[in-house]
A protein has these predicted regions:
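Transmembrane beta-strand segments of Gram-negative outer membrane beta-barrel proteins
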Residues: 21-37
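Outer-membrane beta-barrel "beta-signal"
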Residues: 28-30, 92, 126, 151-166
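Membrane-embedded beta-strand positions of outer-membrane beta-barrel proteins
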Residues: 29-33, 52, 66, 87, ...
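Glycine- and aromatic-enriched membrane insertion/assembly motifs of diderm outer-membrane
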Residues: 42-96
């Protein structure tokens, strides 16, 4: 019982100290994995993706991001390797680590597949120290090329670093 109470107090202290992390002028870098068979669309049997993001807080709780990525798609897909470039905005809700993001990605593969994909995500920035986070997120990508075949829902797990610029 004492161990559980102690762990609860440590978790509460971690959440409280995360409140000042999303300030104007900070920069952000992140690497993440997506897919890992924890996503769904109409055609693929397996997919795995790597993504790198960089961002800047325009004001408290509001960040703009640029991302580069690579996706490998299994199954019957004729274009299994896709490169991704995109931009998005992220809003942190009430300084508690929960964020909402919206953006646009461009995916390209083998001169046969080009797709613009509006994307939305909901995630949580769990601080493991003052600047480093583990960031699980649920995302949705809407294909403008073929909704039923290429739109995607999935889970992303990232590691982020919030850097001070002052």
């Amino acid at each position: 019982m004492i161990k559980k109470l102690f762990m609860l107090m440590v978790a509460l202290a971690t959440v409280i100290t995360a409140s000042a992390q999303f300030e104007q002028g900070k920069t952000y870098i992140s690497a993440s994995l997506s897919g890992l068979d924890l996503n769904y669309n109409g055609t693929t049997k397996f997919s795995c993706g790597l993504e790198a993001k960089g961002g800047y807080f325009l004001e408290d709780d509001l960040m703009v991001l640029a991302n580069l990525g690579y996706n490998h798609v299994g199954g019957d897909d004729p274009s299994p390797d896709r490169f991704v470039v995109g931009a998005m905005g992220r809003y942190y809700i009430i300084q508690n680590g929960i964020y909402l993001g919206v953006g646009m990605n461009y995916k390209h593969s083998n001169h046969k597949y080009n797709d613009f994909m509006p994307t939305a995500e909901v995630g949580y920035a769990f601080f493991i120290n003052r600047t480093v986070t583990i960031e699980p997120a649920i995302y949705y990508e809407q294909s403008l090329k073929n909704h039923s075949k290429y739109s995607n829902v999935g889970l992303r797990l990232g590691l982020g670093v919030y850097l001070f610029t002052n």
